[in-house]
């Protein structure tokens, strides 16, 4: 099985780093996925030096996986502002930091979560 890389777009993605960077790293995340949080907290910091010197650009794309524990992340993603990558990336980091709290919520809590995180529904 091969993957068609030509179908990857930067639509609905957060870009961290220069568009002119020669290396683009496309990362698929879910705001409620513990592996995504682990990567962001423990692996991604090693890329900061390369982002700062213009070698690497991170392209974060949401992975909408139909799995009960991830449903809140799926819905919250719909309200992220992809036109302001820096501000939205700060929010993504906050959502990862609060992931355990988010996990206690279900879809009925989305309006309250949106209010708490200043998301417009």
State where each predicted segment sits.
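Mixed-charge, polar/low-complexity N-terminal
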Residues: 7-8, 32, 38
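N-proximal helix/coil linker or "cap" segments that precede and/or mark the start of modular domains
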Residues: 1-4
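Short active-site neighborhood of thiol/selenol oxidoreductases, capturing the structured segment around
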Residues: 19-34
């Amino acid at each position: 099985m091969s993957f068609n890389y030509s179908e990857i777009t930067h639509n609905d993605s957060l870009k961290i780093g220069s568009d002119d960077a020669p290396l683009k790293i496309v990362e698929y995340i879910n705001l409620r996925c513990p592996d995504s949080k682990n990567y962001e907290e423990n692996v991604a910091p090693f890329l900061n030096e390369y982002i700062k010197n213009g070698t690497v650009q991170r392209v974060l794309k949401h992975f909408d996986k139909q799995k009960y524990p991830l449903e809140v992340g799926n819905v919250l993603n719909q309200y992220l502002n992809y036109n302001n990558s820096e501000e939205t990336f700060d929010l993504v980091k906050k959502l990862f930091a609060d992931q355990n709290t988010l996990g206690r919520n279900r879809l009925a809590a989305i309006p309250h979560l949106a209010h708490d995180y200043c998301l417009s529904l």
